[in-house]
Amino acid sequence: MKGKIKMSTLKCKMCGGTLEINENETTATCEYCGTEQTIPKITDDVVGNLFNRANTLRLKSEFDKAEEIYNKIVGLDNTQSEAYWGIILCKYGIEYVEDPTTYKRVPTCHRTSYDAITADEDYKLAIQYADISQKIIYEAEAKAIDEIQKGILTISQNEKPYDVFILSLIHI
């Protein structure tokens, strides 16, 4: 039965559903949304609770607060690839939404950057500390996010400039 002991309960990064995590697993598939995803190394309940809190905040688009918690996790254990990945998701304002045609969870960017996600130091650290199965998922997600970012930047560069005036009416 080694490897089948219930280790910790975490929330899905995509939909917020409960993931049952077994010992030594580094990826899991959510039974609610079907997304295969990376999971953190849980060393104790404190770390598990911090990951769940950060994820909950990120799911509510409270990216700055979530990023603070991911940084706190890195302060406790600087080899947590999942914490670095969480920081990346917050920096780029990533929310996973359900595609109405495929029902798959796809990334949506609430924040745009001219820099590729793969050039970010936190991404490099996530890759450095990830195992092979986590790296595959991180690299695929980073590629998808980079494509979305490029699309957003292309659209914004093709927009005609316009002036915005703020008018205020003074009632006498």
Residue ranges and their predicted role:
Residues C12-C15, C30-C33:
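Short cysteine-rich clusters marking metal-coordination/redox-active sites
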Residues G16-L19, Q37:
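Cys/His-rich microdomains that often coordinate metals
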Residues G34-T43:
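Short Cys/His-rich micro-motifs in 6-15 aa windows
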Residues T43, V47, G93-T154:
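Short coil/linker segments at helix-helix boundaries
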Residues D45-K65, I69-K72:
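Alpha-helical segment of the N-proximal tetratricopeptide repeat
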Residues Q80-S81:
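Residue-level recognition of tetratricopeptide repeat
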Residues I170-I172:
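Conserved small/polar residues in nucleotide/adenosyl-binding loops
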